[in-house]
Amino acid sequence: MPFLWGLRQDKEACVGTNNQSYICDTGHCCGQAQCCSHYYELWWFWLVWTIIIILSCCCVCHHRRAKHRLQAQQRQHEINLIAYREAHNYSALPFYFRFLPNYLLPPYEEVVNRPPTPPPPYSAFQLQQQQLLPPQGGPAGGSPPGADQPQGSQGAQSSPLSGPSRSSTRPPSVADPQSLEVPTERAATKALGMESSSSVASHGELDPGAFLDRDSECKEELLKDSSSEHGGAPPDSKDKTPGRHRRFTGDSGIEVCVCNRGHHDDDLKEFNTLIDDALDGPLDFCDSCHVRPPVDEEEGLCLSSEGQAREHGHPHLPRPPACLLLNTINEQDSPNSQRSSSPS
């Protein structure tokens, strides 16, 4: 080529316009009649370098894309291999689990029965009452049979402030049409007790002796009402069946006994046999039902009118006491309830 020859020789013959030749003493032929001393002055020099740079960039991009694609394929292959190994080894137990003895594992029933069974009741008498309640007609609202427990046991388990709110009258069942009369009588008794309590609180403090006697009588009547109501007997049969009396034990339990005061021996024996057959065990009778039970036994205030106080000396005459059950939410902070409530 002519420009290579110019590098070797000091003079270079160049071909110009119209095939006319000229000689460049220094440099190389440039253009049609010029001599250039540097290669960067040539136009094709920059064209070659531009093509080289573009091709190099294309090669670099292709190489990086191929490298990234290969790395992604390798990662996916490793993930598939790990998943395949886990799925293959999942069915078989590990080696250190195959020789694990069976007595170290919990029983199947213990694992399945979650949550565990509830704790036993506070006394055996309450358990017997729960066993006797399901054959009777349940409440109209379709509540579970465990909610239809006797009011006596509910009042014993509750605290002195929350007991009266729980021992309110339950809705009458469909199978017991005669129990409709019991809530009406109790509502009238509550209204009478509220009026008498307000009048007594305005006059002054109560007489301690009369208050203790009326409180014990009120508690016995409440126990009789609860036993007759849950037993399905009409209110007229209260005098024919003996009442119940409760006393606290040292282990915070409650013992329920039958009060045999004011009843004949024949009726008492018949009632004893019926209770023994129903509860599969003998039930103790109270030695003295006239003794006043502890103060925490029943929550509430028993107030009666002056006519009922005059009849206190005649135990055979029917005396329906007026009982006021304190509301623990509305009357808890009032000063009247603090003066008239029984000490706990």
Curated annotation (Swiss-Prot):
Region of interest (Disordered), residue spans: 132-250, 302-321
Pfam family name, one: WBP-1
Transmembrane segment boundaries: 42-62
InterPro entries, alphabetized: WBP1-like, WW_domain-binding
Membrane topology per record: Single-pass membrane protein
Major subcellular location class: membrane
Molecular function terms from GO: ubiquitin protein ligase binding
Record GO biological process: CXCL12-activated CXCR4 signaling pathway; hemopoiesis; positive regulation of protein ubiquitination
Name under which the protein is recorded: WW domain binding protein 1-like
Gene: Wbp1l
